[in-house]
Amino acid sequence: MAQSRDTGNPFPDSGELDNPFQDPAVIQHRPSQQYATLDVYNPFENREPPPAYEPPAPAPAPLPPPSAPSVQSSRKLSPTEPRNYGSYSTQASAAAATAELLKKQEELNRKAEELDRRERELQHVALGGAGTRQNNWPPLPSFCPVKPCFFQDISMEIPQEFQKTVSTMYYLWMCSTLALLLNFFACLARFCVDTGSGSGFGLSMLWLLLFTPCSFVCWYRPMYKAFRSDSSFNFFVFFFIFFVQDVFFVLQAIGIPGWGFSGWVTALVVVGSKPAVAVLMLLVALLFTGIAVLGIVMLKRIHSLYRQTGASFQKAQQEFAAGVFSNPAVRTAAANAAAGAAENAFRAP
């Protein structure tokens, strides 16, 4: 407009006014030609060229998982942690299978020991036989004129499941013998301080000399042979005689005065006048009591084992009859008696 005023033409060329965007102020803010429309124009766009592409660094290799311990360490599960019931059942099944295998292994070992024992017994019989087998009990020195009377080997002759029972009965017999020996010394000590107790001292010597061999022969050996050969007859002999022996064990523990037993009653009678002798007698009474209790327990235990073996009174009768008729002396005596009876019958008028 200022230019028009200078030229003096109030009506400038219409071509200059046809395009209103020719104004310099508008041209200055016109967008560049690289954008076709205003819709794609971004005034905040960075016109600098993008940086060159760099490939990402490779990720580090994952570490190998730690080896699981052979036994899973016990830990307390959190309340929100789910329980692994599947693994528990698997572990329980594995534990049950392991226990079953161990049980079968123990049974196989027991059978192997039994077979080994039988094999050694057969070898022993094949080499010398039962007739030439040397007796080893009682274990006497070689220079002693009295030789052993019995052969005893619990590990070889007794089955594996009964060896502990037979060994316990053998120790019971040894303890009863020791108690009778101590009872003899206690009665001797009392006789030394009281000469009026001579009858008790004499009976204590008799019990020592009588019960020691008789108990071994009458109830221990039948019990040993019963378990060795599963003999019902020997079981019945043992039950009868050992029951009587248990009664004597109880009487020994009671200690009736004048019977030759240093039991509780006799020890309490002496405790007031002879304290030193009473102490020894109380120890013997305590030993008698323990033997009586153990004897009753073992009698009940052996009876339960006897019932498990399938033995019976009929079987005992059959064994007794077979043993009697297989004895050469019995057969000879029976034949002589029959021949004598027949001869007398023919001679009778």
Curated annotation (Swiss-Prot):
The modification Phosphothreonine is found at T37. One of its GO terms (cellular component) is Golgi membrane. Monoubiquitinated. Residues 1-168, 298-349 are cytoplasmic. It is found in: Membrane. Pfam families: SCAMP. Residues 49-68 have a biased composition (Pro residues). One of its GO terms (biological process) is response to retinoic acid. There is a cross-link at K315 (Glycyl lysine isopeptide (Lys-Gly) (interchain with G-Cter in SUMO1)). It is a multi-pass membrane protein. InterPro entries: SCAMP. The chain crosses the membrane at residues 169-189, 200-220, 236-256, 277-297. Residues 1-90 are annotated as: Disordered. The modification Phosphoserine is found at S32, S74, S78, S87. The modification Phosphotyrosine is found at Y41, Y53, Y85. Functions in post-Golgi recycling pathways. Acts as a recycling carrier to the cell surface. Interacts with NEDD4 and NEDD4L and TSG101. Interacts with RNF126. Belongs to the SCAMP family. This is Secretory carrier-associated membrane protein 3. It comes from Mus musculus (Mouse). The lineage of its organism: Eukaryota, Metazoa, Chordata, Craniata, Vertebrata. The gene is Scamp3.
